[in-house]
Amino acid sequence: MIIPWQELSTETLDNLIESFVLREGTDYGMQEKTLEQKVADVKKQLVSGEAVLVWSELHESVNIMPAAQFRPD
């Protein structure tokens, strides 16, 4: 189930994004980005619709994923 990011408080959204970024450990290429930059990048993707917040009832957790990969079950 998609969670509308706009309905979350700024603090909650930032905490979810930060948790996601720390969990992912994504490689950002030749130049390492700060945590703040990574959080800002993910937030931009949510705002643009490239990424979505997803609640998994099975795992009882929230994840961020590319909108193109989201398949509602």
From Swiss-Prot:
Coiled coil: none annotated. It comes from the Bacteria. SUPFAM superfamilies: YehU-like. InterPro entries: UPF0270, YehU-like_sf. Pfam families: UPF0270 (PF06794). HAMAP family: UPF0270. Belongs to the UPF0270 family. This is UPF0270 protein PMI2817. It comes from Proteus mirabilis (strain HI4320).
